[in-house]
Amino acid sequence: MPLKGSHPNRAKVVRGVFEGAYNYMKSGQLLRQVINKVNGIDFNNLADRKHFGDVYEQLLNDLQSAGNAGEYYTPRGVTSFMVERIDPRPGESLLDTSGGTGGFITCSIRHMRERYVKTVADEQAMQGSLGLIEKKPLPYILCVTNMLLHGIEDPSFVRHDNTLARPYRDYGPGDQVKIILTNCPFGGQEEDGIQDNFPAQFRTRETADLFLALFIRLLQPGGRAGVVLPDGTLFGEGVKTRLKQQLLAECNLHTIVRLPNSVFKPYASIGTNLLFFEK
C-alpha cells in the first residue's frame, strides 16, 4: 500500500546520492538513449511500478553473475530465509549495518506487506522503522534507487557512512534496535584507527569481528538478530573467543546454519554461517 504524493526529502536524497560519485558513460548517444527510455516510464502507474523493484533486483543479480557487484549482493534465497526466520513486523526498528544494495531491507518490506501491512498507518509504521548504513558509494547509490523502486517515499534512512567509525561507547540505548538483519563484510580488515573505537578486549582489524561486537551492543533487550558471519569468527581464538563469550553471556544464540562454500563464489570462498540470536 504505497503512500501517495512526493516527499519533501526526495530532492535532498537525490543530491546526497550523487555526492562524491564519479561514474560516467563515454558515449553521449548511449546516455541520451538511456535517458529517453527512463523518461518514457510512468512511475506513477502503480500497475507498472510494482514490478520495478523485482526487475531492479534481477539486474543486481545479473551484475553479481557478471562478477561486477558480488561484494554488494547477498543471494535472494539467503535473504528470504533469514527474513522468514526473523519475521519483522511494522513498527519494529530494523537495521542493516552494512546494507549493500538493500536486499535485506527490500525483502523485509515484501515480507511485511504480504503479511502485516493492511492500512496506510501500517505502511507508515513500517517505513518509519527502517535503518540502513552503507560505506561504499556505488552500493549506496544502488540501494537508494532500490528503495525508491520498492515504493519507499523517503529513503533518507539509507545513510552513506561507516558504521564502525563511530566509537563503540557512543552507541547508547537510544541507538538500540529491535531487529538486526545483515551480511557484514568478511575477509577484509579495517583501516588504522578504527579498532581504537572499541574496548581493548575487542580490538582487532578484522571487520566481521568488530561488527559482531557492535551487534551485541545495538540489539535491544528482547531484540532478535540474523547475521552472516565467517568461520573464523566462530572458531578462531583470542578476540574471537572473547566475542563468543560476550555473545553467549548477553544473548541466546539458538540457531547456526552452515552455508555451502559455493554461496558467495567467486567473490569469496570462505566458509560462512547464519547466526540467529536474541538478547
Question: What do these predicted regions represent?
Answer:
Residues 199-200:
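Extracellular loop and loop/strand-boundary signature of outer-membrane beta-barrel proteins
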Residues 1-90, 155-165, 258-263:
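Non-catalytic, mostly N-terminal accessory regions of nucleic-acid modification and defense proteins
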